[in-house]
């Protein structure tokens, strides 16, 4: 029922009725009354009752459409549970100071552990999320389950199943509007991830299946899988490999299609850095200086992907496979970071050589032209595990893909190229 209501809400926005405006301002009125009722300022202070507490903090962000986005984030939990108890709420409300067409945006996530499938470190939970922000409706409901033996957060299995709907109602926020279609998408999504160690080192298997329900869009399905393997060669020398493949049926919405270099457009909405244009300077994006990690991740072809999108002919593929390799070697600066009290437990600076190879494919015609690249890079990562040990943080990369098998017509195969990358596909 919740997803059907969200679907109807998305339809109302598409038809430009006042319903969505009423909903947004109702949320704003609710939070104003909430703050007034407790009579306390929202400045990283704790609002608490005997049975429940709310942690409040101001929040600022920027994009070209909203300008400076001013808001508040609230986190609700039972006192003393440290985000592993019942009735957990994460809520944000923002106002764009440019006062665009849709100035108020919000995000809400509610998590309730399911006692029958929950144990220490192995939570099973009911999840509900809803948001209208930066030109996108996104609403869903689902179940998540994690299995973690003991206290080692690097050994685990996770499974989830969601029913959700999303709809892009304002293209002004997007970097590349051609990478989105304008229909409401209702989908069922299942995911499974397993991480453990074997004789070579740690490995990670990640699979997902998306099934689009035939409502505004036609029926479609997409299956995606990746396998990462760490191979310890010697002390401080490791070879990390990744196999990736995605395949889909006809009628795939545009935002699900993959490019050779970067994550599909839908995945850009996960990070605040890439959700809207202007957070990262537009000139950097348009010049191909910023790479959004994901998909086949042939990072050396970022500039070609972006140039094609800007020219109105994006390189989009429903089926593509890839191999990514990174050889990590000692970095003296990483040793300096490790010696910093407290921060040294979470901050890392890795150096590596990389090689990527991939190709789109067709079940009748086989693989298309194979592309590859090679180079060197550095990754700064900050990871603070959450309450169940899941990785939480960010990865910033500086990559130098100095060789391409198929350079642009005005480039040489060997040439200095550099990229700032958001995220990482190899995270072992």
Identify the meaning behind each predicted range:
Residues 44-118, 145-153, 172-201, 293-298, ...:
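Outer-membrane beta-barrel initiation region
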Residues 46-53, 80-87, 115-124, 149-158, ...:
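Short loop/turn motifs that connect adjacent beta-strands in outer-membrane beta-barrel proteins
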Residues 57-60, 120, 127-129, 186-193, ...:
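C-terminal outer-membrane beta-barrel translocator/porin domains of Gram-negative envelope proteins
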Residues 375-378, 416-428:
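Outer-membrane beta-barrel "beta-signal"
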Residues 101-106, 138-144, 156, 169-178, ...:
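Outer-membrane beta-barrel translocator domains and adjoining extracellular loop/strand segments
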Residues 60-66, 76-78, 93-99, 112-114, ...:
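Transmembrane beta-strands of outer-membrane beta-barrel pores
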Residues 58, 72, 86-93, 121-130, ...:
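Membrane-embedded beta-strand positions of outer-membrane beta-barrel proteins
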Residues 1-48, 428:
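Bacterial Sec-dependent N-terminal signal peptides
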